[in-house]
Each structure stands twice: as C-alpha cells, then as structure tokens.
C-alpha cells in the first residue's frame, strides 16, 4: 500500500450504514467463494448480533452469492447484512468500518487484511494457511482464531468490536512497496 490507498480511504462514502449514530459496521472483502469462509462469518455474525447491535457488509462477487444471501435470511440476520458486490473503492469502507474480518479457509498473502490494517481498521482473522499469523501479532494488531470455528470467531468479533482504530497501521507499513524495496536493497548490500 502507499499514499494512494490512504487518499482513497478518505474519499466520501455515501452509505447510510456509516452515518453518525448508526450501529457499528463489520466488514469483509473477497470473492464469494468457499475459500473465503463467509458462511462461517455469517453464523458468527448472527451470534454477535444477538448480543450487540451491529451490521455486516461483505464486498465482492462470486458463485456463492445466492447461497450466502439465503443463509443470512435463514439465520434471521438478512436485514443486518449487505452484499454490495464489487466496489471500486473498498478503502473508503475499510477506513470507516468498526472491524474487518478475514474468515478464509486458506489464503496466499491476504492483501485485503493488510489494506484494512493500513486504513486503521481493527482486524480478526482465521489462522488459515499462508498469511494472517505472519501478518498479525495476535493480540497486538488484531486477533487470530481457528479456521471454521464460528464460536471463536464470534467471541473475537465481540471483543474487538469496540477496539480503538489504528493498532495495525505500523505493521501494515512493513508490507508496503517502499518497505519491500528497502529490504531488498539491504539484502543486496549484504551480499558478498
């Protein structure tokens, strides 16, 4: 990430759920696919919503949209969940969300997690192969929970929902292009 991400995160967002006085918004971003674990997130969110007024927005498109929308209705949380699809500027959502969730079953390098941290959003992520455990120092910049454990995910979401913003910004900077270039140059300087 860089200055462009930060600038785009400050762009206006015309969404009524982010108006002052509204319940906190929990955000997830990704392809609507089994890999992303949004089915687990919906179940966890239903437990959060039972105790704390909140809303869930899942940005992205994919083949599981209909199934996920049906699941939300079946859980009785349909009015508190939105699937806006693909949006050109997810950073405006990330900078305003109360919490970002990465519920994946597996990942490569989860860019959306790093971007959410760069936007100052508190995060909860699953301990899926490749990524979150290497990015988040559990308890410091966010929380890590077991994959597919909606009880643990819900508990972490409840704990993190009112966490102050900005805890992961410095850690996210270590994944910026400038940091990668600096690390590469240091490695070249040390080479024989």
Locations of regions flagged by a protein language model:
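Short hydrophobic beta-strand element within catalytic cores of glycosyltransferases
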Residues: 122-126
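Conserved acidic donor-binding segment of nucleotide-sugar-dependent glycosyltransferases
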Residues: 137-150, 158-163
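Aromatic "clamp/platform" in nucleotide-sugar-dependent glycosyltransferases that forms part
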Residues: 86, 105
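A charged, aromatic-enriched C-terminal amphipathic alpha-helix characteristic of glycosyltransferases
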Residues: 165-191
């Amino acid at each position: 990430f860089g200055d462009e991400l930060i600038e785009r995160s400050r762009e206006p967002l015309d969404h009524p759920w982010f108006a002052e006085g509204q319940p906190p918004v929990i955000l997830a971003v990704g392809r609507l696919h089994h890999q992303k674990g949004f089915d687990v997130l919906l179940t966890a969110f239903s437990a959060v919503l039972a105790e704390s007024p909140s809303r869930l927005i899942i940005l992205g498109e994919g083949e599981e949209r209909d199934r996920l929308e049906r699941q939300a209705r079946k859980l009785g949380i349909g009015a508190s969940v939105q699937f806006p699809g693909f949006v050109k500027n997810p950073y405006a959502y990330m900078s305003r969300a109360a919490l970002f969730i990465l519920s994946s079953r597996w990942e490569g390098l989860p860019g959306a997690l790093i971007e959410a941290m760069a936007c100052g959003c508190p995060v909860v992520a699953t301990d899926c192969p490749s990524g979150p455990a290497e990015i988040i120092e559990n308890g410091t910049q966010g929380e890590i929970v077991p994959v597919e454990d909606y009880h643990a995910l819900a508990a972490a979401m409840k704990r993190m929902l009112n966490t102050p913003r900005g805890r992961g910004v410095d850690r996210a900077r270590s994944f910026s292009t400038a940091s990668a270039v600096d690390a590469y140059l240091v490695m070249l300087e040390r080479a024989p």
